[in-house]
Amino acid sequence: MDAQSTKDQGPEGADAGTLSFTYHIGDMFEDAPENCLLIHACNSQGHWGAGIAKAFKQKYPKAYTAHNKFCAKEHSKTQPVPTGSAQLLAPVDSGSQHWIGCLFTSAKYGKAKDKPDAIVKNTTASMSMLLELVRMADGEVSEIRMCKINSGKFGVPWEKTEEALKSIILQEGWREKIEIWEP
């Protein structure tokens, strides 16, 4: 099935220095071009066990191993990965040339996940950091795709996350266009 897309329905006269979204229906992994960045929100414990994170773990097992090592081995329980930060994983899985972007929007998962307002606040800082990491990758990333982050297992209405993301003021060299995918 071909993915369907619609243009951003943001407010008229929106600042040119903010993120621009196009919306797509379909599988964000399917037919993703080489060097595409695929973004999801995750906890800072390195656990990809449910929701779209589980799909990332199944499709990109070597990326998951690197992510888990970063969270669980390179950071101690007393010095965990800070929420509001991000990780950019270069392509490591054979047969896949996709970058993985991890937005650390909640410290924990399940019933212990952060409150929605904290997750939304962490999202702006996480995305800002990820956009800077992409800039530092110096043109290696072809395009950016993202699910409706936080709206699944973290239970945050997409509209709140979307508003927070659109409040980010882009810095020089940051990507502006992001494709938003939903099944």
Curated annotation (Swiss-Prot):
It comes from Phaeosphaeria nodorum (strain SN15 / ATCC MYA-4574 / FGSC 10173). One of its GO terms (biological process) is purine nucleoside metabolic process. GO terms for molecular function: ADP-ribosyl-[dinitrogen reductase] hydrolase activity; phosphoprotein phosphatase activity. Substrate binds at residues 26-28, 41-43, 48-53, 149-155. It is an enzyme of class 3 (hydrolase). InterPro entries: ADP-ribose_metab_enzymes, Macro_dom, Macro_dom-like. SUPFAM superfamilies: Macro domain-like (SSF52949). The keyword Hydrolase applies. CDD domains: Macro_Poa1p-like. Transmembrane segments: none annotated. Belongs to the POA1 family. Pfam families: Macro (PF01661). One of its GO terms (cellular component) is nucleoplasm. This is ADP-ribose 1''-phosphate phosphatase. Highly specific phosphatase involved in the metabolism of ADP-ribose 1''-phosphate (Appr1p) which is produced as a consequence of tRNA splicing. Keywords: Hydrolase, Protein phosphatase. Its EC number is 3.1.3.84. Residues 8-183 form the Macro domain. It catalyses: ADP-alpha-D-ribose 1''-phosphate + H2O = ADP-D-ribose + phosphate.
